[in-house]
């Protein structure tokens, strides 16, 4: 079926938090949650659950929730459900996989990280390399455009892994992950991609990206707070993580420590189903996800243009970064005001647009913003033109000279 246009009014009706009258531009830190997701979480908690098994209804219900969540994430990311791993957070999963992957590293080996990334895709690799005696190579970016430098400037035949973001949570930059993956694979390096900030804004396909590992966080796309990693089951079979002796050696379960949060996994499935229904009625959920996310991308691009044009026309406002491909995330400063002052003034106007480095500390420093960062405004499918205009009015009327 052809993609339908996004209907903001219909979408907004599913989010109780929007009834508070706040314009939420803090989606890059975590989206608001629609009613079907909250109901799925509550339903799982109250329906009767046990540890996974096949004897009782409660055991089978838990098993079905896990199986369903893996299938849902696979449909979202274009992955194999047998390669979907759940964890407490994307940060925790990356630390776990860094520890596992680095067991084979040693002096002379190299790891590439970028200054564009969230620290969750930097520090785990830096620490793992230090423990192994391997060398960390830094891939920089242009502080004016926020575009990554060429990977070949730091890649060598000794590179074991390249860690890169699919979209900067601070500046919105969308690097060419496929080109990076292809280049890294030429020297047999693995590619670990942070897709946390991309997944809420664009159709995603693991094979198209060419990455070996792709992580994301459901709470950024209307779901509960946990982390997800997708990889080839065959690749996961080659890895031996730390685990308890009685726990299964099966993939992907052997990477999941302890009992899974079944209620949160039920929420993940509901979030993917919600996304799939945003702008498509195709019979297959993967097709619905792709069509709906294409509609999301188109809708958000229009609001992004409005926001960029509006902020760019206000005296005293500086926009940071001008990447060629980007998510609908804008970082800006106001002359004579600290980021915190802007954040507080916007909050008084009913606009949630926080100020920080947002854990992209290396990127903030490279962009000349130090450890303070700047104000970040992120657009979501429930954002409206009225929300954008409200932010622009607050900046223009309350934060800049008359």
Give the role of each language-model region.
Residues 1-402:
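Pyridoxal 5′-phosphate
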């Amino acid at each position: 079926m052809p993609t339908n246009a996004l209907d903001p009014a219909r979408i907004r009706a599913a989010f109780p938090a929007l009834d508070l009258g706040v314009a939420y531009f803090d989606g890059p830190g975590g989206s608001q949650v629609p009613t079907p997701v909250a109901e799925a979480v509550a339903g799982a908690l109250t329906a009767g659950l046990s540890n996974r098994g096949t004897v009782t209804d409660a055991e089978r219900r838990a098993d079905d929730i896990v199986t369903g969540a893996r299938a849902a994430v696979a449909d979202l990311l274009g992955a194999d459900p047998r390669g979907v791993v759940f964890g407490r957070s994307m940060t925790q999963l990356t630390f776990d996989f860094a520890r596992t992957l680095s067991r084979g590293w040693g002096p002379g080996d190299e790891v590439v990280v970028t200054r564009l990334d969230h620290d969750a895709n930097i520090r785990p690799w830096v620490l793992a390399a230090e423990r192994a005696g391997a060398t960390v190579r830094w891939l920089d970016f242009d502080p004016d455009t926020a575009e990554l430098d060429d990977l070949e400037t730091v890649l060598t035949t000794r590179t074991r892994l390249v860690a890169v973001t699919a979209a900067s949570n601070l500046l919105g930059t969308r690097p060419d992950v496929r080109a990076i993956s292809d280049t890294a694979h030429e020297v047999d390096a693995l590619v670990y991609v942070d897709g946390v900030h991309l997944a809420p804004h664009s159709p995603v396909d693991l094979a198209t990206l060419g990455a070996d590992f792709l992580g994301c966080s459901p709470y950024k796309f209307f779901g509960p707070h946990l982390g997800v990693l997708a990889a080839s089951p065959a690749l996961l079979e080659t890895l031996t993580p730390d685990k308890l002796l009685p726990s299964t050696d099966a993939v992907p379960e052997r990477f999941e420590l302890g009992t899974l949060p079944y209620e949160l996994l039920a929420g993940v499935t509901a979030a993917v189903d919600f996304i799939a229904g945003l702008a498509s009625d195709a019979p297959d959920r993967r097709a619905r996800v792709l069509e709906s996310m294409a509609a999301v991308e188109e809708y958000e691009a229009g609001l992004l243009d409005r926001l960029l044009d509006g902020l760019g026309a206000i005296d005293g406002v500086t926009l940071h970064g001008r990447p060629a491909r980007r998510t609908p995330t804008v970082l800006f400063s106001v002359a004579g005001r600290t980021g915190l002052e802007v954040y507080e003034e916007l909050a008084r106007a009913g606009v949630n647009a926080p100020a920080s480095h947002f854990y992209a500390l290396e990127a903030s420093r490279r962009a000349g913003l130090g450890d303070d960062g700047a104000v970040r405004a992120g657009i979501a499918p429930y954002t409206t033109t009225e929300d954008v205009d409200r932010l622009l009015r607050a900046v223009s009327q309350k934060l800049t000279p008359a």
